[in-house]
Amino acid sequence: MASIDESKEKLKELYATREEMEKEMAEIAQRLTEPGMPGLRGALVDREGFPIPGVDLYQVRGDRGRYATLRNDHAEVTKELEKRLSELHLQAGVTK
């Protein structure tokens, strides 16, 4: 089992990683929800099936893919944070 200081350091690293993910996710969401953009889930074609004019479809698809990856990774990091925080509380209780 890691020492309390090591556990705290790992928690700080995980928290910083999660914050970076949240920052990138917010930037992507802002780009995709600008006026004229399709958003995170909107259609990329019009009612007739043609691509939406003035929208870089490759960029939108890339952003959506990256957002989905970040969302999944964020969930994993959050679970790891919860686990390590519980372990830290357990360690702190044992050392008292």
Pin down the residues of each PLM region:
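Intrinsically disordered, Ser/Thr/Pro/Gly-rich linkers and terminal tails that flank
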Residues: 1-96
